[in-house]
Amino acid sequence: MNAGKKRSAWHAAAAAVACMLSLARPGLPHAQEMADAASAAQEVALPADLAKITRDPVAQQARWLRTAAQRGTLAQLDDATLTTLFKALDPLAVPLYIRNGPNGYPSYQFTMVRQERISGKWSDTPDHMLVKTTREPLRVYAKWLPGGAHAGQETIYDTTQRKDEMYGHLGGLLGKIPLWTALDGALARAQSNHQVKDLGTEFITNLYLTEGKKYQEAGVQRPTRVEAKTIGGVRVVALTYETPTGRPQFYAKKEVLGLDLHAPYFRTVESYDNDGRIFERIIIEKIAPATLDDTAFDPKNPDYAF
């Protein structure tokens, strides 16, 4: 039997065993049974070189993750191997890898899909956005793309101009008159629970590191679930963290963070409240460093509709 057939047979056997185990636990919900079966089916024996990594000190594991991401090694692994590897790593390896950074780029642009629960109501249509940003000084240009909620809107935040305000317009025939509004004003809060300056990989990273300290204090030592998967066209290692008390002590009762396979930042986020309802979903579809001069944050840019 060749390697491919062996792996297929192993996966089938693992799934069957997982299903039998779940049938022996009549109180377990059907959805959890299926999740357990899928998780068991994904686990494989690690190659010797990867197994050795999991026995190294945590600092070495974090350094290896950075090298493996940069060289494309992580992206070359199949989902089952990625899942098993990240389950076997020291629980502090990923936080250290993330903390060591870099968690973004000095100047970059990205497209993202964002969906939130605003004032208790889940948005039926997600925002689809193009974002350009520099970090020093902090400047952000955001455009809401066709097909998403609030399509046609544009906004610019430039900390060298006004630190507490952004300049933007609502788009459409009646919304092309630009105006200055507060970063946390009523108009901004009506569309998002976050400020425009929070757009970017750095905000997600900082939130993860801050929450991580609270996870440890609460006895949450490792993710409750690890799974390599593709979300919205983006392949990630999804790390699920569930907290004992949820909000307001923690940002979310359950958080699912999709780790990029090439850099130490997250590409996807799903956040759930204490009742198990999702209140935030983010997918950073494409991201790349970019050279952005002053015109990228100038409302007079001919490519913009201010």
Outline where the language-model segments fall.
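Gly/Pro-enriched, hydrophobic low-complexity segments
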Residues: 34, 44, 48, 145-147, ...
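An acidic-aromatic
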Residues: 32, 38-75, 128-203, 276-280
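N-terminal leader/targeting segments and the immediate start of mature chains
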Residues: 27-113, 117-126, 134-138, 146-149, ...
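Bacterial N-terminal signal peptides that target proteins for export
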Residues: 2-14
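Bacterial N-terminal signal peptides
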Residues: 14-24
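Short, solvent-exposed coil/turn segments at beta-strand boundaries
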Residues: 104-107, 132-139, 157-165, 259-267, ...
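Short acidic, gly/pro-rich beta-turn/loop elements at beta-sheet edges
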Residues: 120-122, 141, 152, 178, ...
